[in-house]
Amino acid sequence: MSAQKPGLHPRNRHHSRYDLATLCQVNPELRQFLTLTPAGEQSVDFANPLAVKALNKALLAHFYAVANWDIPDGFLCPPVPGRADYIHHLADLLAEATGSILANASILDIGVGANCIYPLIGVHEYGWRFTGSETSSQALSSAQAIISANPGLNRAIRLRRQKESGAIFNGIIHKNEQYDATLCNPPFHDSAAAARAGSERKRRNLGLNKDDALNFGGQQQELWCEGGEVAFIKKMIEESKGFAKQVMWFTSLVSRGENLPPLYRVLTEVGAVKVVKKEMAQGQKQSRFIAWTFMNDEQRRRFVNRQR
């Protein structure tokens, strides 16, 4: 009997426990990382970053038709079910303008990362087209390698380097471009020291040695920025005003509920017409994203029905 994970979006493909026998057939590397729980059930050694990477390879190949996926050491290895949840909830948000899922949406991923995870899921699940921005040339090279290694993705995903220090949308959204939505998983910590402390806590909780903790723990731009998550999203909100007619919905993950009030204040200051909070849950982990738009209901309907 398969147990369901509480809180996942109804369209998320990962409600049931992992079918490890099938996933090991898809990616035989995964077999070496299987372990038994105290209850005698087969599981994956989630404390081992190499095991998580092998699991991701199998999940992306089996569920999302991404046969060739890899990331360099030192970059974040994201949990696939949680990333998929953001995509599915975003699809629901876009559907509110017309009452049906938007099949040909154009999405901007701020900080696409070396893993390119959101575009990979969004292209497969909804046929969306993505532009991914990134400050790190190494991350961009990794994401491009994934795109090039999987047939069809070159037509659906394009990448852009953010060359302007501190900018988010400026320099990425071109003059005559339009996007149905933006998405972002912002850096959480406010300093390198805080990021190291967070990684150390995670290492101790998982029982990792220091060498293991370095694998897929995350790069500086993935983990921290000056002022942390709130400062990053505030900057995003302030910049978004300049693209009010080119983007229907701006969205960002927010890691902590207590970070919302200062963000709501900035959204009021910039004149956002509508603000939405979407709560999500993956097992015991609670998360959320906020979305804001400068368009009213009729303007959003017209935007969705524009010539593409």
From Swiss-Prot:
Reactions catalysed according to its record: adenosine(1618) in 23S rRNA + S-adenosyl-L-methionine = N(6)-methyladenosine(1618) in 23S rRNA + S-adenosyl-L-homocysteine + H(+)
Entry keyword S-adenosyl-L-methionine: yes
Molecular function in Gene Ontology: 23S rRNA (adenine(1618)-N(6))-methyltransferase activity
EC number(s) stated in the UniProt entry for this protein: 2.1.1.181
Highest taxon listed in the record's lineage: Bacteria
Biological role: Specifically methylates the adenine in position 1618 of 23S rRNA.
Protein name: Ribosomal RNA large subunit methyltransferase F
The organism of origin for this protein: Escherichia coli (strain SMS-3-5 / SECEC)
Lineage: Bacteria, Pseudomonadati, Pseudomonadota, Gammaproteobacteria, Enterobacterales
Gene name linked to the record: rlmF
